Regions:
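N-terminal accessory/interface modules of nucleic-acid-binding and processing proteins
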Residues: 1-204
Length: 206
């Protein structure tokens, strides 16, 4: 078990290095992470991306069996996630993607949000009303502006942590103002990419 945990820990570290050193790899990670923004944190998203980047809905076996009435397919590979137990001791937990399950009697399919022609206009109207966005741009423009507003409102909560942790990184060479500008622009572009990816609007990798 200790050896398995070490392997997964190393996988997480290597994946983190890869996605933060390559714009293309970061975009591919965002495409996966966008599908799990609500249920899993960044560390989990990294490991899901590393082990099954095409996953769409993940849950542990009890959830699939008891709540969804779906059995995990024989021979399928679980996705290992790192958890902390009593006293902070790490251990591995396992989840399975819906593609590796099948329904039994009374089985349910997970609800996966998707943009359709039927809900496109209601989505646009809701975004305009919620975020006070004027104009008659298309959905892509509306999502871009919404993401920019959200980032502008929230990036300041995370900036102090970044400034504190910048030692021994390339950010160390920048003053506070330029770190802030770089962080805000990177965060905005990442959120926009993830939102557009989830909405299946065509986007090009940088």
């Amino acid at each position: 078990m200790a050896q398995k945990w070490q392997t997964i820990s190393e996988l997480a570290a290597e994946t983190s290095r890869k996605v933060t050193h390559s714009p293309e790899e970061w975009c591919r990670f965002l495409t996966t992470a966008a599908r799990f923004y609500k249920a899993y944190d960044f560390d989990d998203q990294l490991l899901i991306y590393a082990q099954k980047p095409n996953a769409t809905a993940c849950a542990d076996m009890p959830t699939w069996n008891n709540k969804m009435r779906r059995w995990v397919n024989a021979g399928s590979t679980a996705i290992a996630l790192i958890r902390k137990g009593y006293g902070g001791k790490p251990y591995l937990d396992y989840v399975h993607d819906v593609a590796d399950t099948h329904p039994v009697r009374g089985g349910k399919d997970p609800w996966l949000w998707k943009l359709t022609e039927e809900n496109r206009e209601p989505v646009m109207e809701r975004l305009r009303d919620t975020f006070g966005i004027d104009g008659s741009g298309d959905l892509g423009d509306l999502l871009m502006e919404t993401a920019e507003k959200l980032v502008q409102e929230s990036y300041g909560e995370y900036l102090p942590d970044l400034l504190y942790e910048r030692e021994d990184s390339f950010l160390e060479e920048l003053d506070d103002f330029n770190v802030e500008v770089l962080f805000r622009n990177t965060l905005r572009a990442s959120v926009q990419y993830a939102v557009l990816s989830l909405s299946l609007i065509h986007i090009s990798e940088p």
